[in-house]
Amino acid sequence: MDEPSDDENSEPTPKKIKREWVKSYSNKAMEMMKKMGYENDKGLGKSNQGRLEPIIAVQQDGRRGFGLKLDTVQSSAGQWDPACEELEIPEPVLWLHNPGSRADAYSLDQLMGHLVTGEKKLTLDGETRYCDPAILHHILNAKTVFDDLNDNEKRRARSRCNPFETIRSSIFLNRAAVKMANIDSMCNFMFTNPRDPAGQTLVAPDELLYFTDMCAGPGGFSEYVLYRKSWEAKGFGFTLRGANDFKLEKFFAASPESFDTFYGVKEDGNIFDESNQDSLNEYIRMHTPQGVHFAMADGGFSVEGQKNIQEILSKQLYLCQFLTALKILRPNGSFVCKVFDLFTPFSVGLVYLMYKCFQQIAIIKPNSSRPANSERYLVCKYKRSDAETAGIVAYLNTVNLMLSDESQLDENDVLEIFNANELAEDEDFLRYIIDSNNAIGKKQIVGLRKIAAFAQNLELKETKQSEVRQECLKRWGLPDKLRQAPENKPTDRLLDELLADWANERSWLSLPATEMKGVASLNATIKNVADWYFVPVGREETNINACSLFLCKSRGNLLRYTEHKKWELVETAFEVQPRSIFFGQIVYEFYGEGRTIQRMAALHIIDGICLGGVDIRRRPYRERVSMCDKFARSLNKPYRKDRTFGALRSKPLFRLQDMGSFFANMRHYVLKDNSQRLGFALDDNKFFVPGGIMMFCELTNNYVSAHSRSRGQLYYFNVRNKESYYKDQIPRNKADEIFASFRFSFSCRLLWKWTDLRQVEELATEDNPKILFRSDFVKFIADKLGHS
């Protein structure tokens, strides 16, 4: 990749040449020289003439020998004029809109007529249809000059001359993450905050932001997205196994629990394999049937010694990344992909087909991408429907098979995939490609010449690096600080942070639920059935299965608050994001029935205080439960083959007034000992056996909800001062007074425990004031609703 591309993400810091030469000598040496007549700032000659500093020793680099003469282009470049370089912050983004024919205008048969094969090309010479010939000539010449420089020289010169160099990887594991932050900012955060053409969000309130990161090890793009969105996003990673795999343990700026790696049906992460592409699509659709909101691709490989034909060598990689994106994206989805030179008819034809599959495209060069390389990014916005893009997907599949069949392409190659003459008829597209290539090419020539100048003249220095760093980080929404590993704080200190103003008085943490043992206890506690909700809870066979508070301190470090008021490590492995504290229960979920039944531990979340650092304690009860559900869906990986963690899900929530339908949906399951128990079916062919229900009120003691007949709206009524507020007109300062916080809901929770199998039978009853039967509870609810 031209002057190593952006898989330059972890580079050694170059050694500095000593400038303050005086410090290189001991005080004794300087004193001896002064005794012999030496004076500061005067030469050593008889008349104080001569050099004022020592001759610097030869800086030997690598295997370079004495007497080497660098190319005249480089030598002349030793003089650098800063006016040659134009900095644009922010960078302009020029969108190309596609108002013309749609993707479904092309069938597979029609597109096959565009295919051109011929003798394999191993040079870009003559590829001037889509750029100014002079620019291509200067780019290729400028790159060739660097063959005379070794890696250390190039690296040192690049570090000194690039105005954006000191941004480096910021708080992330590599520079790719910073590039994604830069691109997201350039494009008005269209990836982490996607909106439709009318400006409305494309992510529903209870929906996760789904994304895919392809050919992306070690994962910088994903680290940025998770830094920005945390667990409100869920990512799918696809890359080659091996040395360039994802390094999730190196995610310091974000937690990787919401990231799910998948390597295809072949288990190798090879994106050239059609079966891998299709299995990735199937895996994603199991989680989100519509597809992902956006896809990112950052593929590249070493082209050492063949930098000038990187585009030709990367053609199948381009195609497969584009093709996979079309398969996995939902309608209105977006795509960003790293590409290099776009001079050949093959590459331009690929971009044209993507242009037809989306409403808008842009080719951008972010400032975080070094100016001297040919790297750029294709950004595609608002994907058209799968039905519209089906013909192009089938065509790209066919071309990929041809490229993969080495026997067919031993000497020949696919040279064009869309007729160049027909493409040229789309004047807007043609002009866009030419202008883009020329603009990026001019900047690249300037960048290459600047590196050559700085390599030749060690006195040159870029003075804007500090100023540019601060401005860019601010614009991209990144902190100006160094990367550091997350701190593993002591339990009490972390609790102080997460509980905040609830930390001083913690007695409520150990408050038990109030048990309902008869209709009298229901009458004493439940004023308005409409304000109450319930979740089914497990049987609590042991203390470990009791409903408890859970605290995740760090990755793999989940604690449970015991009845002894101590935090103990949970032995079962669950993948929970650090800085989380919530109320939940470890239950056994079952798969199958009878003697073949299998059971596995699962963690069910009931309510939350803080989820992955997001404070939800004072949000209304239903909103907290909805966020707990999103949190669990983001972290859970139900379809992984190598499941090393227990399942994570939120408890199913029901309105108390819907208890009848809750029981109607339960059925009897046969357990391993041939006993039959009422079980609750989960959404993945599993079930669990409840041992009771736990109830929560969404309002504080002073309020009840009611329905206004005159306005047809819900309102909240204060039973003490008789004030009332419609749901959509609640003052901000009243919300905390009306809606129960986590602490209030937790402290006032009720428990109906099923200690007798007859309690949950539909018609069973008994005149026992200490046992609450289902029939009595259902009648209580009906009576309450009848009186409201």
Swiss-Prot record:
Cited Gene3D superfamilies? 3.40.50.12760
Q: Which Pfam families match?
A: FtsJ, G-patch
Q: What is its main location?
A: nucleus
Reactions this protein catalyses: a 5'-end (N(7)-methyl 5'-triphosphoguanosine)-ribonucleoside in mRNA + S-adenosyl-L-methionine = a 5'-end (N(7)-methyl 5'-triphosphoguanosine)-(2'-O-methyl-ribonucleoside) in mRNA + S-adenosyl-L-homocysteine + H(+)
The cross-references to InterPro entries, in alphabetical order and at most eight, read: G_patch_dom, mRNA_Cap_2O-Ribose_MeTrfase, RNA_MeTrfase_FtsJ_dom, RrmJ-type_MeTrfase, SAM-dependent_MTases_sf
Q: Which UniProt keywords apply?
A: Cytoplasm, Methyltransferase, mRNA capping, mRNA processing, Nucleus, S-adenosyl-L-methionine, Transferase
Give me the residues that bind substrate, please.
143-147, 158, 308-310, 373
> What interactions and quaternary structure are annotated?
Interacts (via C-terminus) with r2d2 (via C-terminus).
According to UniProt, the name of this protein is: Cap-specific mRNA (nucleoside-2'-O-)-methyltransferase 1
- The species this protein was found in: Drosophila melanogaster (Fruit fly)
Give the gene symbol: Cmtr1
